Amino acid sequence: MHPLEIIDRYYEAGSLRDLLVKHSQCVAQRALRIAFAHTELAIDTDFVREAALLHDIGIICCDAPSIHCYGTEPYIRHGVMGAQILRREGLPRHARVCERHTGAGITVAEVLRQNLPLAVPQPTTADEPYMPVTVEEKLICYADKFYSKSHPEREKTIEQAVRSLSKFGGDGAARFLDWASLFEGYGGGLS
């Protein structure tokens, strides 16, 4: 499977495709650097490379003109829209990364508390559909927080990523810090 071929099925050459690919390559490089440093975690590096390159494919469906996205969906739904695309492509495992990488994952409680335009599973379901579960999902979600789409060439520090996540509440920032400890031995906390 060649992620760029899949991207090319949905994106024409130009600013949006270039931005998506640059951002996704940065995310993939950081995730792979961490994966290769942590052989004890038995991370599927082939999958990480593919899924990191495809994790934001859904931005084309969203309304975010500042990053050349002229779709109709709210930007918060880019993961859900990307998951739909990748399921149609026969890539359900990659689709889960799309759904679960927004923020530092989003709990159902956060969806309800913030009135986010995301589907909520039935109350009897224990599943958290927008939360990373596997180490690969967590790693890609983590690596993604270091690169914005508006300036993909600028790598954020852990502290800058935490500040960015803290704007949406402390839960996501705390999850991110747990991953920073796991993946990079970071010992700082929320300030």
Kindly label every feature range from the protein language model.
Residues 18-23:
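A short, charge-rich alpha-helical start-of-domain segment used by transcription regulators
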Residues 1-17:
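Generic N-terminal amphipathic, Lys/Arg-enriched alpha-helix
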Residues 12, 40-154, 158:
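Divalent metal-dependent catalytic cores for phosphoryl transfer on phosphate-bearing substrates
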Residues 165-191:
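Charged phosphate-binding loop/patch that engages nucleotide di/tri-phosphates or the phosphate backbone
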Residues 25, 92, 181-184:
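Generic structural signal for well-ordered, non-transmembrane alpha-helical segments
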Residues 8, 28, 32, 82-87, ...:
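Amphipathic alpha-helical segments within well-ordered protein domains
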Residues 51, 55, 105-106, 162-175:
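Short, mixed-charge aromatic SLiMs
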Residues 4-5, 27-39:
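Long, contiguous secondary-structure blocks with strong helical propensity
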